[in-house]
Structure formats: structure tokens, C-alpha cells
A protein has these predicted regions:
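A charged N-terminal "starter" segment
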Residues: 1-133, 137-144, 150, 165-167, ...
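Conserved, mostly hydrophobic/aromatic
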Residues: 39, 61, 83, 115, ...
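Short beta-strand segments
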Residues: 59, 131, 178-184, 231-233, ...
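Short acidic, glycine/serine/threonine-rich loops at helix termini
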Residues: 69, 92-93, 112-117, 139-143, ...
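Hydrophobic residues within beta-strands of alpha/beta enzymes
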Residues: 79-80, 100, 128, 230, ...
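Short acidic/polar capping segments at secondary-structure boundaries
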Residues: 106-107, 133-136, 144, 184-188, ...
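Active-site loop/helix belt of alpha/beta enzymes
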Residues: 148-149, 155, 165, 172, ...
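Charged (often Lys/Glu-rich) extended helix/loop segments that serve as interaction or gating elements
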Residues: 292, 306-338, 359-524
Length: 524
């Protein structure tokens, strides 16, 4: 099952709604919820697109809940971490160092020393991905410092534990750490500027021209760093495969060039970035990206191709599986002030665009709903202008089946037929618009209407935008969908808000409390 398939997500709401209401009753609101069936479906889709011998690792920055990391480990995914903190969480989840990679733009000396110590102890990380010549030099210093203190006996003992070519080399019994060099492919990722990492102006990675300096800083082919290949990551939420294809092509070409002088240079890690869009928005699935690889590899001489290929998906594995259950605090009816209610400027983080009142088409009252989940639980709408659908679980105290799903059903069916044909996409848009208009007419009499949903935080950017919802009152329940990635992982205690609980809905429908709600004592 494609984890980005709108139909699958639509079907899951009908199954999950009773469980979401029960979670609110049992654990309170707001609460993070993970649908394990959706996680398993997403993992199966990625595994099908990138089967063995691909090395697959889950990027913890998407959602670092140890219980979730452990579930993904059981589904064949190691861990990609960007700090000792994430490394500790992966270890707590049962992932061995041999299946953990350390990356990230902000590795400290302490992070690098920890990687060197792990190698010295005979339990090295799979590799460390280096971002700059400075970082290569810092890791080399850390390795040399530990190596100088090791006894010959310790070296031989550690080498015997790492006969697979990682950590210590058995032949040279000197401490070495496997590393990749992160390539900045200098391509246009065609995504939100806040999610782009492979552009020329990005802070991430080394350009091709900077590679030689990093190799020298790390001590060259015989130094304390064993250079194993290249890592690249174009960006997140990639709307098309073109930029990814160009980046992988450049990575393969550079790897082939460097492999001539570095026999150990045998690995290409292509990162992640596979998109998950709001329902009804067409995006390429992981298989679309994977289908680019055979032609790219065929263009490289056989003796210069990578022996190991790796991916590091994050969002695509967990985003669709996540929900936030929240409770209504206020409902207001207002005629807009001398300026349309502030809306997020989709072009930039944490900025507002105010539409002049003259631009309004009528003076109808606007329904405003404030819920008890906000930017502290889901930062993405305020940070990126990300869109997350809000659906009603109860209306005036009674359980409801969200008519919003009908909108998504029509849009999803239309977009699904559109594929990549421009004319089909135009027809799909018209079909979706017509379906929404019919829903407007059918639901108006029953009180369903567009409602602006805001959070409880003392910031005007704390809003989730407009959503079609039934009549609501204080105490009613709503759910925010597609929050499994960069929701709980980016939460904050701003305004003195404790951490919400995190609950799994198991495949059989039972509930598992994966993390308890934080108390007031946990603040400060």
C-alpha cells in the first residue's frame, strides 16, 4: 500500500474515529496518536521500492519516540541520527550501532569523540557522514587521540570484533572510523525553501570542489578516517523526481571519479525526502524515485559503481500514521475587522499576510474555533505554512462521521486518475471543485461550514487555517491528521505546556500508551 495514497488515509479515519474518541476519554487532550497499521503499510511500500540489498534506515528527526523506532527496527529499518541524543534514543529502542548512522550539520566535538570511542570499543557506528573539511579534521583528531591511548592488546581485541571492515581494520590494527562525505549536489530541490538542503546556497554538505580539502583534512586514504563513499540529501517534500535524479547522477559520477584513487570508496547514501502531501494532492511515491536508479547506474562503468546503496526515509514512514486529538475551547461568530483575519504567508516562515477588507466578497460572520492543541504540538503550519486537515470527531457532544472525507474522496479520485498528464490534472481540478461545490450545497442546511481553527498559544501565527466542520461547542473533539512527522519531534513547552501523551492504535484496535503525559513538575 502506498503510504501517500489518499484513499488509504480516508479509509483509516472511519476505522480510527472510535479509537480517537476513546483516547481523548482515557488519556485527555491534546494527545498524539500513531496508527500502527499505517506505519506498517508505509514501511512495506518503501521496502518494496528499495528492497535488499538496499540498506534502509529511519531518520529519527521525523519522530524520535523510542517505541516507534523499535517498531520500525522490527520492520527492517535501522536508525539515522543527527546527535548523541538521537543516538541514545535509537540505542534505547534496541537498534545496534552497526545499523546506526550519524549525520547532521551540527555535530559537536563530544559527538565525534563518542563515535571514535564506539569504534575503539569494537561497536562502531555504520558510518559518520561529514559535512565539511573542519568536521573531517575534528573527527580525525578525536580518533588519533583515542588511538594514542589504546594498548596494542586493545587494538587487536577490537579489530577481532569488527572483521566486517568497520571500525578497526584487522590488517593495520590502528583505530579507524568509517565515514561518508556529504555532497551538496547544487540542484534546485523544487520544494519549500525551508525544506531545501541540496541547493548551492545551502549550509549542508560539501560541493564537489570542496571534497579534496575534506579528504586531506581527514588524513587521506591511509589516515584515521576510512572514506567509504558519499551521502546526499536533496531536501524534504520533493514534489517531483527530477531534482533527486539529477542529484543522484552527480553523486554517482563523483563517486566513480574518486573510487579510482580510493578503493574503499564504495557506498552511496541517497538520503530521503519522499513526500507526503495533503489528501487530494498528487505526489510521486517512493517507487517513482526508485525507478530512476537502473538507468543512472547503467551509465556508470561497472567497476566504478557503488557496492552499497542506502536510503534514509523519515516523513514517508510516519507522517500519515499520526493524528493529534484535541478539544474545542471556544467557538465565536465574528464579522471581520477592517482587515481579513490574518492568514499565514505561505512563502515564508513565521510571517503573516493581511488581506485588506475591501478584498472580501461579503460581510458574512466568520466562525472561529480555538482548540487545545497548537503550535507547541504542531509547529509546521506556523513555521512552513504547512496544511493539515482538521476533522470533527464529535458535534455538540455526539459522534460524527466527517463530511470532510467526502471532499477528499472526490479530490482523491480525480487526482488519482490524473497521473502526470497536464490535461488530466486540469480536468481533475475541475472535478474536485465541482464535488466541493456540491458538498457545500448539501451540507449548508445541516450547519457544516468553513471554520477557522486556531490554537491556544499567545501568537497570531498559531492557526491551522480553514476547515469544513459541523456545529461545534466547547468540549467537542477534533483530530488533526498527518501529524506523525515533525509533530511531537518539534514540540515545545512554550507557554508552559507539558508534553502530551503518545498513544499507539495497534493493528487489532487496542491502545498502547507509548509515552505518558508530562506533568507540571517536568517544566523548567
Amino acid at each position: 500500500v502506498d503510504p501517500a495514497t489518499p484513499g488509504e488515509a480516508r479509509d483509516r479515519l472511519g476505522v480510527l474515529a472510535p479509537a480517537l474518541r476513546e483516547i481523548a476519554r482515557r488519556y485527555g487532550t491534546p494527545a498524539y496518536v500513531t496508527d500502527i497499521a499505517s506505519v506498517e503499510a508505509a514501511a512495506a511500500a518503501v521496502g518494496s521500492a528499495f528492497p535488499a540489498p538496499w540498506e534502509r534506515r529511519y531518520s529519527l528527526k521525523a519522530n524520535d519516540l523510542p517505541a516507534l523506532v523499535a517498531r520500525l527496527a522490527g520492520l527492517g529499518f535501522g536508525a539515522n541520527v543527527v546527535s548523541r541524543g538521537e543516538w541514545a534514543l535509537a540505542t534505547r529502542a534496541g537498534v545496534p550501532n552497526a545499523d546506526i548512522t550519524l549525520e547532521g550539520i551540527g555535530k559537536t566535538d563530544a559527538d565525534l569523540r563518542a563515535a571514535a570511542r564506539a569504534a575503539a570499543a569494537g561497536v562502531p557506528l555504520r558510518w559518520v557522514a561529514l559535512e565539511s573539511a573542519d568536521e573531517a579534521a575534528a573527527l580525525a583528531r578525536a580518533v588519533r587521540a583515542i588511538d594514542d591511548r589504546m594498548t596494542a592488546t586493545a587494538r587487536v581485541a577490537a579489530a577481532g570484533q569488527v572483521a566486517a571492515g568497520r571500525g578497526l581494520g584487522v590488517g593495520d590494527v590502528r583505530l579507524r572510523v568509517d565515514v561518508l562525505l556529504r555532497l551538496n549536489p547544487e540542484v534546485d530541490p523544487e520544494t519549500h525553501r525551508g525544506l531545501a538542503t541540496g541547493a548551492a546556497v545551502s549550509k549542508f554538505g560539501l560541493t564537489a570542489d570542496e571534497m579534496a580539502a575534506a579528504l586531506d583534512a581527514g588524513g587521506g586514504p591511509d589516515g584515521p578516517l576510512r572514506f567509504r563513499g558519499l551521502h546526499l540529501h536533496v531536501g524534504s517534500q520533493l514534489g517531483a523526481a527530477g531534482a533527486w535524479r539529477d542529484a543522484v547522477r552527480r553523486g554517482l559520477a563523483l563517486l566513480a571519479l574518486l573510487r579510482g584513487g580510493l578503493p574503499t570508496f564504495d557506498t552511496l547514501d541517497v538520503g530521503g525526502g519522499f513526500p507526503v502531501a495533503p489528501l487530494g494532492v498528487p505526489v510521486p511515491d517512493p517507487g517513482r524515485f526508485a525507478r530512476e536508479l537502473p538507468a543512472l547506474l547503467a551509465a556508470i562503468p561497472a567497476d566504478r559503481r557503488p557496492d552499497r546503496l542506502a536510503i534514509e526515509p523519515g516523513r514517508v514512514l510516519v507522517a500519515r500514521a499520526g493524528w493529534i486529538v484535541a478539544r474545542v475551547l471556544h467557538v465565536r461568530e465574528r464579522i471581520g475587522p477592517p482587515g481579513e483575519p490574518a492568514r499565514l504567508d505561505r512563502s515564508g516562515p513565521l510571517s503573516l499576510a493581511v488581506v485588506p477588507r475591501e478584498a472580501r466578497t461579503d460581510d458574512r460572520a466568520e466562525r472561529l474555533v480555538v482548540i487545545d492543541a497548537g503550535m507547541t504540538e504542531l509547529m509546521r503550519p506556523a513555521l512552513y505554512g504547512a496544511e493539515h486537515a482538521v476533522v470533527a470527531l464529535t458535534s455538540r457532544g455526539h459522534a460524527v462521521a466527517s463530511a470532510l472525507e467526502a471532499v477528499h474522496t472526490g479530490r482523491s479520485a480525480a487526482w488519482g486518475a490524473a497521473a502526470a498528464d497536464r490535461d488530466a490534472i486540469r480536468a481533475a481540478r475541475q472535478a474536485a471543485t465541482g464535488h466541493s461545490q456540491r458538498l457545500d450545497e448539501a451540507s449548508a442546511a445541516s450547519g457544516w461550514r468553513l471554520v477557522r481553527v486556531d490554537g491556544p498559544i499567545c501568537e497570531s501565527t498559531d492557526t491551522f487555517g480553514e476547515h469544513r466542520l459541523p456545529p461545534l461547542r466547547r468540549g467537542d473533539l477534533v483530530a488533526i491528521r498527518d501529524t506523525g512527522a515533525y509533530g511531537a519531534a518539534m514540540r515545545s513547552a512554550y507557554n508552559g505546556r507539558p508534553r502530551p501523551p503518545e498513544v499507539f492504535v495497534e493493528v487489532d484496535g487496542s491502545l498502547t500508551l507509548a509515552r505518558r503525559r508530562g506533568g507540571l513538575a517536568s517544566l523548567g
